[in-house]
Amino acid sequence: MQRDCVSPTKLENRIKKIVHKPFFKIALFSTTSMTVLGSVVIAPSLPALQSHFQNIAGIDFLSKLVLTLPALFVMLFSPLSGYLLDRYGRIKFLFPAMAIWSLSGFSGFFLDNIYLILVSRAIFGIATAFVMTGATALVGDYYLGEDRQKALGLQGFATAVGSAVFISLGGYLSSIDWRYPFLAYLLGIAIAIFAYTKLFEPHRKKTKKTHKEVEGSNQKFNFLMFLPVYLLVFFCMVAYYISPTQIPFFIVHNLGKNGDIVGISMSASSIAYGVFSLFYNRFRNIWSIYGIYALGLFLMGTCFLLLYVFHNYLIVMVSLMFLGAGGGLLIVNSSSYLLSIAPEMQRAKALGFFASAIFLGQFFSPLMTQPIVDRMSILGLFLIFTCLLYMLGLFFIFKSRMKKNFRKLQS
């Protein structure tokens, strides 16, 4: 009863104090980092997994599907998760999904059938849809304005740091046995327990809605308004996922390195992703949305240009840092823009389709890139994506200048 008597202003001030506490942020951003950990941690074990199941027909494709199949199910179930989270709340779906995420991910440790592993990865993908949409929606609910931009930067940083640590660990474990990286998913249980003690259902203002909120909740979801963001994110993830799906084979087969070296290489990308995500708010204070898109695309394009021209391990490390830096800027920039234009009562739904675009890109990455590798070699793949990313970056420079000229004419 006492809680109901607290005025909205006092309640909002109390919530603001809670969400800025360090342990609260650790719980929230650890939850968001789980979704990226889900894919990258097993990337270094793919060559060894492929060798283990070498007698299975089509194992070249199936081994990559172990990494990317969850993305297909995230794509399919993220819109549904967004609808349910908007309608019934975030927390009641988030914690069960985290438990399922952890157990289904861990099951790959003891399964010795490639098709059962793929089934477990499908279940894992469904759980990931709810975790990713729910956790990102909570970031949008807990923080506003500049605080939200900072929170999204911290989210990207936490995701990248977790990714760097666990992909390095995954690389080391895969050098012992390809099954061992699946043990890392048990960390999700510990994160879920910790998050359960800190996170709470955000205040949704159910009793007294403003006219704008009622209108927003009844308004039909305008998918076309968000479509350009979804398409851009899809393409960026196709390019970004060349790193875990193709570059491990490039390092092992072309450069003759071991699986533990693959993990260290992937972690370089994650560290750069985190650093550039962390400083996103500073980039945003200087450059426009279009300007940051152009910068991110040029950074990613430079990665593939370096890989195409130079063929040594040091250059691979440097190029993957360019890839991570560009990817971090592009994803945080897109999520920040999306949260700024999405109505409050449709936020989770918009983020659900955003998650679908991300994981659809991850799923289609090997489907789109492997035929190019088969026909033109992996170097041909690097050249094609260099050209595509640079051309798209030039397009956003043009858009940015057009917008500036339009503003000058108006003034």
Please provide the spans of the model-predicted regions.
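Helix-to-loop junctions at the C-terminal end of transmembrane segments
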Residues: 77-89, 276-288, 373
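Paired small-residue
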Residues: 100, 104, 115-123, 314-322
